[in-house]
């Protein structure tokens, strides 16, 4: 996905709205004054006058609309790394045991040499041992904001008749991590989120959150493989998740597996037999199918 960001005046804004009137779409972002989608490209005009075009045909649409795309205008492709970027990623949402760790990190081009020397990459490609070695160095060097939602708190917030579902809770966590990082005075040229839902769905859930920021977002699938800032967040978040999983296991006297496979079913059934449902409320995400599978194992 390509992203174009530029500043336009009131006259050009009015002309743009007229040109794209047949392609208007709704946006839940309170900072967006006008939104449209044409030829697969999403166009967002912010109240500040910032215009964002997102999609593989962003350049072509900009030319069609006669937009002033100068050399100074930022153009980001999947592997663009030459600007200051905030990248956000989460770990733990697919694991029955453990909480959800969300991290937003700010990477400046001057950090690239340091990151490449460390061998920073998508945390999914790195061993847990390597992650546990690299993460403390990243935490010390790279401005970031970490959030950890414990399983106990997760179960209070997520589920039937609860305030959040599995998607909206991640929207809330990503938004808060980025918001808090921006509050530290960070000034990125781009904010990238590893896409876990569509932009429209993200903005729908975002509407009920208290904290907001005007900066436009880029949603990129497998962003940790394309942006160093997201890769950094992925590593720090993975380490935070692993530490939490280990601590929960120590508290209960069991080694808790990552993931949501049969190993999780087995350990969950053992916890149920030893301590009852309260142990899973403390250590696991109850709405996962593993809970019922663990209960079924007890009856065999």
Curated annotation (Swiss-Prot):
Domain of life per record: Bacteria
Domain named RNase H type-2: residues: 83-300
Catalysed reactions listed for this entry: Endonucleolytic cleavage to 5'-phosphomonoester
GO MF term (any one): magnesium ion binding
Names of the cofactor(s): Mn(2+); Mg(2+)
GO biological process: DNA replication, removal of RNA primer; mismatch repair
Keywords of the record: Cytoplasm, Endonuclease, Hydrolase, Magnesium, Metal-binding, Nuclease
The keyword Endoplasmic reticulum is assigned to this record: no
Residues annotated for a divalent metal cation binding in this entry: 89-90, 194
Membership in a protein family: Belongs to the RNase HII family. RnhC subfamily.
Protein's name according to its UniProt entry: Ribonuclease HIII
Organism: Streptococcus pyogenes serotype M3 (strain ATCC BAA-595 / MGAS315)
Lineage, broadest ranks: Bacteria, Bacillati, Bacillota, Bacilli, Lactobacillales
């Amino acid at each position: 996905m390509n992203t174009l960001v530029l500043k336009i005046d009131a006259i050009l804004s009015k002309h743009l709205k007229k040109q794209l009137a047949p392609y208007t779409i709704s946006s839940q972002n309170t900072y967006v004054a006008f939104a449209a989608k044409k030829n697969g490209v999403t166009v967002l005009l912010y109240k500040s006058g910032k215009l964002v075009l997102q999609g593989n045909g962003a350049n072509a649409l900009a030319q069609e609309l006669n937009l002033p795309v100068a050399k100074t205008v930022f153009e980001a492709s999947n592997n663009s790394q030459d600007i200051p970027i905030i990248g956000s990623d989460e770990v733990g949402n697919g694991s029955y045991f453990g909480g959800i760790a969300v991290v937003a990190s700010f990477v400046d081009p001057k950090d690239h040499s340091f990151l490449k020397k460390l061998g920073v990459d998508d945390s999914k490609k790195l061993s847990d041992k390597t992650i546990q070695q690299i993460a403390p160095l990243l935490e010390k060097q790279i401005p970031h904001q970490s959030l950890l939602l414990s399983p106990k708190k997760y179960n209070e917030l997520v589920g039937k008749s609860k305030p959040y579902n599995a998607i909206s809770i991640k929207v809330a966590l990503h938004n808060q991590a980025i918001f808090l990082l921006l509050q530290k005075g960070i000034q990125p040229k781009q904010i990238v989120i590893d896409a876990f839902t569509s932009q429209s769905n993200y903005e729908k859930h975002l509407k009920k959150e208290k904290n907001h920021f005007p900066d436009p977002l880029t949603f990129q699938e497998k962003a940790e493989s394309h942006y160093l800032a997201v890769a950094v967040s992925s590593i720090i978040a993975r380490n935070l998740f692993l530490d939490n999983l280990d601590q929960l296991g120590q508290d209960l006297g069991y080694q808790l597996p990552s993931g949501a496979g049969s190993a999780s079913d087995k350990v969950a059934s053992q916890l149920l037999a030893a301590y009852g449902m309260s142990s899973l409320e403390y250590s696991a995400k109850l709405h996962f199918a593993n809970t019922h599978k663990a209960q079924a194992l007890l009856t065999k």
